[in-house]
Amino acid sequence: MRVTTGIRVRRQFGEDVLRILRARGLVDNSLLIKRREDFLIIPLAQEVAREELRELGVEADLVAEDFEEASRRPNFFENLRSILSAEDLKIIPRSYDIVGDICILQLPKELYDRRRVIGEAFLKSMKNIRIVLNKTEPLSGEYRVGGYEVLAGEGGTETFYREHGCIFKLDISKVFFTPRLSAERIRVASLVKPGEVVCDLFAGIGPFSIIIAKKNPSVRVYACDINPYAYQYLIENIRLNKVEERVKAYLGDAKELSGRDLKDVGDRIIMNLPMSSEIYLDAARNALKRNGGLVHLHVFLEKDVDSNEKYMNIEESFRRLGCETKLLSSRRIREVAPFKYHWGFDIEVKPRKY
């Protein structure tokens, strides 16, 4: 037995919290997770402040606990110690993404000639991982798709991913998806009120739309995406999660759809297109009901850009579209690159009173 700090979280959130913590190397795998009534107590590999957990979207108690030692296989870094130099080990990324049975690394160029060995080491250390990918190109283009190469494993890049009681089928090489928005998705779903109409303008394979529909049976969600591969997975995921009566999928550009099929229908608009969401503010205005509503706007900000200044720019853009706004909340969601962050703004938008 060993006494250390752990996170106490309700069981229904345990799977999601574990995924977030493991992706950042924060779980002490040498100790067993404890189960106590309706809670899990997860041993931490290092001290973490409550504020840091909140930034990751984890609301939980920090507790000192007596944990039982686990018999386990060597972890990723232990497998690499006999293969890589101490200098190489220092630049191995400590965080990675797990999407279903796929692990996604982003290795620095300095490790390029050893990438296969690194991939094999990771595959050996994770019993539920089928294939290890290295991200070779950033998200780009109209479809927001990155470039990947297989480091280890086999079986292709299509997988099933589970989150907040929902299941999603996707091919990570053909569609945009990140598990790092898990906390943001359930946060938005918890804000949706009974009977609301939600327009998800950049829905991808449907995580925001489907989680909202599963958690709120009386809502109506219109989900659209311009990527035909994402659209096909969206259709399939709607069926897999049995929300056909609540979610309707559209294939097409948000600007065109908001001026036609989705015009004046939404109480709440989701705009998860942080690289260029601001050029679609007119689409949000068009999709909102005539008396206005709420917009969840996602943007990328460099570290030296003030979020209040960014909101003022957004406010001015809406003003030019004939709208007045009120900032309800804003938050830094995640780091996407050194000194570059993904931010979310919850904005009330109404027609201007002249």
Q: What residue spans do the PLM features occupy?
A:
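SAM-dependent transferase fold signal centered on methyltransferase-like domains
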Residues: 1-354
